[in-house]
From Swiss-Prot:
This is Large ribosomal subunit protein uL22. Gene3D superfamilies: Ribosomal protein L22/L17 (3.90.470.10). PROSITE patterns: RIBOSOMAL_L22. GO terms for cellular component: cytosolic large ribosomal subunit. SUPFAM superfamilies: Ribosomal protein L22 (SSF54843).
Length: 109
């Protein structure tokens, strides 16, 4: 089993979780191929983390299965934009931590 972790990525955790659920339990090679055609920013990020987890384990992507793909919320960057009458309203810029575990596929299947 090998792991990869990407922290403080400027990405909404809610939107990233939608993509993470899609690849859980998939073959790593198939997961990377399917993420390539998704239009989301999260798809590109998660694809890189899966590739990193496969490389960390020293196995081929065709022999690896995504055991878990988890997206946790990181700190929220708060910025302010000026509004009318001297006021300011906050802009929230959420960050995420992406965690991927990859296991080698059993040979008997």
């Amino acid at each position: 089993m090998s792991k990869a972790l990407l922290r403080y990525i400027r990405l909404s955790p809610t939107k990233a979780r939608l993509v993470a659920r899609e690849v859980q339990g998939m073959n790593a090679e198939l997961a990377i191929a399917s993420l390539e055609f998704m239009p989301n920013k999260a798809a590109k990020v998660i694809s890189k983390v899966i590739a990193s987890a496969v490389a960390n384990g020293g196995m081929g992507a065709e022999n690896a299965v995504v055991k878990s793909c988890r997206v946790d919320a990181g700190p929220v960057l708060r910025r302010f934009t000026p509004r009318a009458r001297g006021r300011a309203t906050p802009i929230r810029k959420p960050t995420s931590h992406v965690f991927v575990e990859v296991v080698e596929q059993s040979k008997d299947k």
